[in-house]
Amino acid sequence: MGLLGDVESLSLGLCWAFRQGSGKVALDTQRFTHLSAGSLKLLPIPHAFRAAREQSSYVASEESRILVLTELLERKAHSPFYQEGVSNALLKMAELGLTRAADVLLRNGADLNAEDPVTYYTALHIAVLRNQPDMVELLVRHGADVNRRDRIHESSPLDLASEEPERLPCLQRLLELGADVNAADKHGKTALLHALASSDGVQIHNTENIRLLLEGGADVKATTKDGDTVFTCIIFLLGETVGGDPEEAQMINRFCFQVTQLLLAHGADPSECPAHESLTHICLKSFKLHFPLLRFLLESGAAYNCSLHGASCWSGFHVVFERLCSHPGCAEDDSHVDLLRKAETVLDLMVTNSQKLQLPENFDIHPVGSLADKIQALHFSLRQLESYPPTLKHLCRVCIRLYLQPWPVDVKVRALPLPDRLKWYLLSEHSGAVEEAV
């Protein structure tokens, strides 16, 4: 049997021993089932290892195990299979996080760039997948390329670390070791986009991974070649809540809210076009369903029109009234009444988001049904507000609310040392119309 079998078999035994620590250790005999008793005796393994095969336990210290490995490597250093054997053993050590054994292998010629024959991952990729941060640091200190991508998926170690919440320690270590936080794969996908795309809001919550990447300088404007942005995943997950399990929908909404908070805190713009990639636009279209998130967006300063092209591209006012006019219902319909109430609050939030109201051109509506008069009155109040110079009272309300941004503005309003009547006026949900006095 060649050195490849020698080193591989010995490494398996050493790996298991290292995992159990010093003292009485049970070997994983299943890992030696491919070796016959005769073949095992032919390996240059000390008698203690062969006895362990039969007795399933042995006593050895970590130092003695390192010594065994070192002696074997020195004895077989001139074998034609040496390089392949030690490099293959390094992959196994990386998987199990056995840093001392890996260090011995590296000092004795193991190739940092050796790839697993099945996955084509290097030892660094494997260490990340198994969440072995100390192994990650050891490999990088020995010269492993911290940004190296695998040949199949073009995933970097940072990409892999970002995809699972359990790999947060490796993610942090990679950033500390200088990994490029904004490096992109062949599809233009950065580690931040990997973290977002891997989250389902129910079983996988990469919130802390996303936070760490953003704090490490991840670009919130990153876009893939297919046009996916940091909000693409959130928009998709919000769509999954429609008609789904209520408990799962609640979990998804909570995750989307938390991630949106993080993204906006680091400068992400949820109101950019195209409309189908705009989180603000999506929330406006379904403002009743996504009311808490929409409120957060508007109270955090998100534009209610397209932030790139203004109301000529898309307008929040137009979207809200389009939704109101298309909703079937009657005056006694609780769902329609709730829709109207939330529409009033959303419109009020948009009005207090800027000192000068910006209504879209050709802003005409044609409501039908028993609530048509109320919808028409709401529309008329906005037209009036746009037609006349804003009152001092309105300007003060807008300025104070803008000053109290970001969310939650109403909580901050209630904490102000003001009379209750003034607080009532500053709150977004106080009025039945957008503005009672023009």
Feature-to-residue mapping (PLM):
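Positions within ordered alpha-helical repeat solenoids
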Residues: 107, 141, 163, 176, ...
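Conserved ankyrin/ankyrin-like repeat signature
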Residues: 68, 100-101, 134-135, 166-170, ...
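Ankyrin repeat A-helix N-terminal signature
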Residues: 59-61, 92-97, 126-132, 160-167, ...
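N-terminal segments that cap or nucleate solenoid repeat domains
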Residues: 2-110
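Solenoidal tandem-repeat scaffolds enriched in leucines and small polar residues
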Residues: 151, 163-224, 232, 242
